[in-house]
């Protein structure tokens, strides 16, 4: 049985999706694998909308 390391990447703001793509691509280059799909969370505070995108990633340990 292999051990797994688990991490959640997140980004928010005007360039959230391109930023998350860059984070995920960098993680993939370091041996991480996306786990499941992207999650989007939206919050409204004082008439300001914030969207946060999240991606779970795993890495198999020796």
Predicted regions and their residues:
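Terminus-proximal functional modules
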Residues: 1-62
């Amino acid at each position: 049985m292999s051990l797994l390391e688990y991490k959640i990447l997140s980004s928010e703001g005007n360039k959230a999706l391109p930023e998350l793509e860059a984070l995920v691509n960098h993680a993939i280059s370091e041996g991480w694998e996306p786990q499941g799909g992207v999650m989007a969370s939206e919050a409204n505070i004082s008439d300001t909308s914030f969207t946060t995108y999240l991606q779970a990633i795993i890495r198999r340990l020796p």
